[in-house]
Amino acid sequence: LGKYSSIIIFDPVPAKMRDYCKISKELKSDGSNVAGVLCALAPEEKKKVEALVSSYVRPLSERDINKVISEPVSLIKSDAMLYCYEDWNPEQPVDARGMSDGTLRFIAIVVALLAVAPHSLLLIEEVDNGLHPSRAKELVDMLKDLSRQRQVDVLCTTHNPVLLDELGNKMIPFVSYVTRDENGDSHVNLLEEKENLTKLMASGTIGRMMVNDKI
């Protein structure tokens, strides 16, 4: 762990993201001030980051979101709110209160990957929580893409077999699973070291192994 410049535990809470938040340069661990972090950026940088966030969210949503922005609110412009624009009503912005939990968590994770320092370790529990299973590919692609660009390692937990399947066999060396012994103690195991892994993989995917209680 000494190789990392920082270790961040990130667990975005959509309910908190729907409130107004203070404009701030530091992202909170619950993602509640995503809008404030975006608003704290210099104008040109803000446009670039919002465009990048939008590009990852665009293929994600069933509501056809084409743009995600953050804007200051109140008379003194000290607070911020997250907004999106949808294809079916492009002139009418929708604030965070009208966005789904899955979309808000996804936005928060994108912003977190852009906000943390290079060579950090970002830990995200139940990374796909609130996201429709059909969007697992978009989530995996985003995590791979941004972590590579930003030189950030990402450690995620999930109970979703669809997400595990989307990882593909090339990611097996990076997958671990947790078991309990007869004393109730938990143990983290590398998937690639599992006995009879080749035989198990011949009869199904990683997700199927999980569903069948093989891992």
Specify the residue positions occupied by each region the protein language model found:
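Walker B catalytic acidic pair
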Residues: 125-126
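Phosphate-coordinating catalytic segments in nucleotide- and nucleic-acid-processing enzymes
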Residues: 1-117, 207-215
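Motif I (Walker A/P-loop) of helicase-class P-loop NTPases
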Residues: 108, 136-139
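C-terminal lobe/lid and adjacent interdomain/linker elements of RecA-like ASCE P-loop ATPase modules
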Residues: 138-215
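Alpha-helical structural signal
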Residues: 100-103, 136, 160
